Amino acid sequence: GRNGWLDRIPAYATRVVQDERTKDFTAQFWIPRPFDWSDDTFDIARHDELLIYEAHVGMAQERPGVGTYREFADRILPVIARDGYNTVQLMAVAEHPYYGSFGYHVSSLFAPSSRFGTPEELKGLIRRAHELGLAVIMDLVHSHYVRNLNEGINELDGTDHLYSPAGPAGDQPHWDSKLFDYGKPQVEHFLLSNIKYWLEEYRFDGFRFDGVTSMLYHHHGYVAFDSRDRYFDEGVNEGAITYLSLANRLAHDLRPSCVTIAEDVSGMPGICFPQEEGGVGFDYRLGMAIPDYWIKQIEEVPDEQWDIREMWSVMTDRLPGVKTVAYAESHDQALVGDKTIAFRLMDKEMYTHMDRASENLTIDRGMALHKMIRLMT
């Protein structure tokens, strides 16, 4: 071009590595032998009810440093299965330049993160999970992408509107990232082919769609949903609804038992309704009000005033016919500028009295309430 040559990573690169010396990311030509899936006939449909363990491969190890796919397969998966879970939800699968983003500032949507190992080692992790009877769900980030030019797809053709709306409309200011323009054919093709790729090449059993609320609305959900009009006015991103409907149709056409979960806090009607009834087609919605409720109880309400009827009401507050993933906490509460339920309950006492030889009322209370919260949820 007029300004000289510029090296960029292809949008569809399936292997991206970071140079240890320069720290630059580059695409790698990667053509391995066909992966041996052996007798992998696993089907998530065998599980009537999902018991989901959320995990980050890099942070799952006890040792200092970044964990690997192999370590996770050998050491962590057997523990998850032994503890009674039947599904693993993996964070930070697609490549991302900033490790501290927990995988949510994605740069290469088709490349599994090389920090944790090779693509074949990720496939080995999924094969091992299936051998243990565990389904594997990918935390899929199609709500935004990293604004970095060197590592990502931003301004890939020299403009700011190849994959995004032009100008400020293409920015997600709350997340310091770029938005997709779901009304563009090249965006639909890019993202839908990404879903097909992860399902067929890696045999994931489903997806948790991250940031669905941000996708559904041009205001990204930063308003009070105080009337029904909020779900049907000009703030709704119709292109995103079309894309999410196509995504669900494709995923379920490719694999009828595929599980799709929507991270939506707005309560958009129809998000989990069948497409034959005019819905978007998600199988589950995340029960995002539940963790906030437990935090409020712990921080603001004395133990003796916890109301069992109120707890039951919050746990069962959902639209008729909408299957909901209930959870006490996730990375949003435990990692992203917050703290775990256990730390809220036991605080600094955890560092000195988490052993059977110590008698400590703070620890005893914390453990009892922690068990009760998990049981209720």
Set out the residue ranges of the language-model regions:
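Substrate-binding/active-site clefts of carbohydrate-active enzymes
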Residues: V17, D40-I52, H56-V236
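The feature marks proteins involved in alpha-glucan
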Residues: G1-Y53, M59, P64
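A broad, low-specificity signal for short, low-complexity segments enriched in glycine/proline
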Residues: A11-E20, P97-Y99, G167-G170, D283-D292, ...
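Short acidic, gly/pro-rich beta-turn/loop elements at beta-sheet edges
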Residues: L6-I9, R63-G65, G100, H219, ...
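Charged, low-complexity, helix/coiled-coil-prone segments
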Residues: I9-D24, R63-I76, E131-H144, Y182-I195, ...
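Conserved alpha/beta catalytic core and glycan-binding cleft of carbohydrate-active enzymes
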Residues: R203-D205, V223-T377
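Generic low-polarity alpha-helical segments
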Residues: G1-R2, W198, T377
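Glycine-rich, flexible loop/turn motifs
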Residues: W5, Y98-G100, H105-V106, P112, ...
